[in-house]
Amino acid sequence: MNKMAGVVLAGGQSRRFGSPKAFAKFNGKYFFEIAVETLRTVVEDIYIVSHPSLIDCFRQKTAEKVIMDDERYRGQGPLAGIYTVMKECEAEWIFVLPCDMPYMRPEAAAKLAKYANEKFDAIICAHFGRIQPLVGIYHRRTCKQIEKLLQAQDNRMKSLFRHCHVHYVNEQDFWEDEIVFRNVNTPNEFDDIVT
């Protein structure tokens, strides 16, 4: 069993962005490729979790494993993606990144990965007082609790945290520059990063 697998969450509707964010380009690379490269520094196996309508497009652009959410929980957000990968692979830990944080650094991912240990169920960034649940590492023992939440249609990440032992990593212990957490949700935000 591999100790850790990577997950790129790329299944959102991108309504505010107007087109699938995963395929926006920054510095000549698709957003999802930046996330894959960041994870590649700490994991061997990487899964891209996406919407069924985008699966073929991803498969044309990458050799990574591309999957869609378990159909029972499709449309329930990041928790559904994390659950699906936990069911798909045997890794003990799942390192999660969203596809829309083009400033996330491989060095930051490597630093966060060092916090994974058996005392915790999840390692989550709490950067400058803001919890960043989509930049985190989840132990597979959280899978049953995630499934319970999904069955109850409670797809809030914070609901999971109430039921598990979370280690919050702050900026002094992770990464001082807040820009690594800058995500892109709108065309204006995209214009800001490319100009």
UniProtKB/Swiss-Prot annotation:
Biological-process GO terms, alphabetical: Mo-molybdopterin cofactor biosynthetic process
One GO location term (cellular component): cytoplasm
Binding site for GTP: 9-11, 21, 69, 100
EC number: 2.7.7.77
InterPro entries referenced in this protein's UniProt entry, alphabetically: MobA-like_NTP_Trfase (IPR025877), Molybde_CF_guanTrfase (IPR013482), Nucleotide-diphossugar_trans (IPR029044)
Keywords: Cytoplasm, GTP-binding, Magnesium, Metal-binding, Molybdenum cofactor biosynthesis, Nucleotide-binding, Transferase
Required cofactor(s): Mg(2+)
Record: residues binding Mg(2+): 100
Localization, UniProt: Cytoplasm
Gene Ontology molecular function: GTP binding; metal ion binding; molybdenum cofactor guanylyltransferase activity
Catalysed reactions, as listed in the record: Mo-molybdopterin + GTP + H(+) = Mo-molybdopterin guanine dinucleotide + diphosphate
Broadest EC class assigned to this enzyme: transferase
Family named by the database record: Belongs to the MobA family.
Functional summary from the UniProt entry: Transfers a GMP moiety from GTP to Mo-molybdopterin (Mo-MPT) cofactor (Moco or molybdenum cofactor) to form Mo-molybdopterin guanine dinucleotide (Mo-MGD) cofactor.
Domain notes from UniProt: The N-terminal domain determines nucleotide recognition and specific binding, while the C-terminal domain determines the specific binding to the target protein.
HAMAP family: MobA
Protein name: Probable molybdenum cofactor guanylyltransferase
Provenance organism: Geobacillus sp. (strain WCH70)
